[in-house]
């Protein structure tokens, strides 16, 4: 069996359409649990402006860090919170750390965290 070189891969990718490339990137992100988004450097804001920016945060992300010992219980809570199917919820829990809910209110994020922690999960709110 011939070995595939980087040049072969690049040649193959060059022939793909933009839509095919976008789908491939999405599949690679899901397969390897990474994001293709470039990191964004943000300049530090000094003084009161920084405090105001921190206080104004209205959208939060609930990140499932780890399932803990009660994986089945965590999967049940994930299904209830996200309305995912059993396989999708299990894949999400198995792939931790993963974002569970994004852009939700502080109250909703805290409630989701409470339910997940009660089920034995390790959760972070960003």
Curated annotation (Swiss-Prot):
Domain of life: Bacteria
GO cellular component terms attached to this protein's record: cytosolic large ribosomal subunit
Gene Ontology molecular-function annotations: mRNA binding; structural constituent of ribosome
Biological process per Gene Ontology, one example term: translation
Stretches that traverse the bilayer: none
Pfam families assigned to the protein according to its UniProt record, in alphabetical order: Ribosomal_L12, Ribosomal_L12_N
This protein's UniProt keywords: Ribonucleoprotein, Ribosomal protein
NCBIfam families: L12
Similarity comment: Belongs to the bacterial ribosomal protein bL12 family.
Physiological role: Forms part of the ribosomal stalk which helps the ribosome interact with GTP-bound translation factors. Is thus essential for accurate translation.
HAMAP family xref list: Ribosomal_bL12
Subunit structure: Homodimer. Part of the ribosomal stalk of the 50S ribosomal subunit. Forms a multimeric L10(L12)X complex, where L10 forms an elongated spine to which 2 to 4 L12 dimers bind in a sequential fashion. Binds GTP-bound translation factors.
Protein name per UniProt: Large ribosomal subunit protein bL12
Organism field: Geotalea daltonii (strain DSM 22248 / JCM 15807 / FRC-32)
Taxonomic placement: Bacteria, Pseudomonadati, Thermodesulfobacteriota, Desulfuromonadia, Geobacterales
Gene that encodes the chain: rplL
């Amino acid at each position: 069996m011939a070995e595939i070189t980087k040049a072969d891969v690049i040649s193959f990718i060059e022939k793909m359409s933009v839509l095919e490339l976008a789908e491939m990137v999405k599949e690679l992100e899901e397969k390897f649990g990474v994001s293709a988004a470039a990191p964004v450097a943000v300049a530090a804001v000094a003084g009161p402006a920084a405090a105001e920016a921190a206080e104004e945060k209205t959208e939060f992300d609930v990140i499932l860090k780890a399932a803990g010992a009660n994986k089945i219980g965590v999967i049940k809570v994930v299904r209830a919170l996200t309305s995912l199917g059993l396989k999708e919820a299990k894949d999400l829990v198995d792939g931790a750390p993963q974002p569970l809910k994004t852009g939700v209110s502080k109250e909703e994020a805290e409630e989701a965290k409470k339910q997940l922690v009660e089920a034995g999960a390790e959760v972070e709110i960003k």
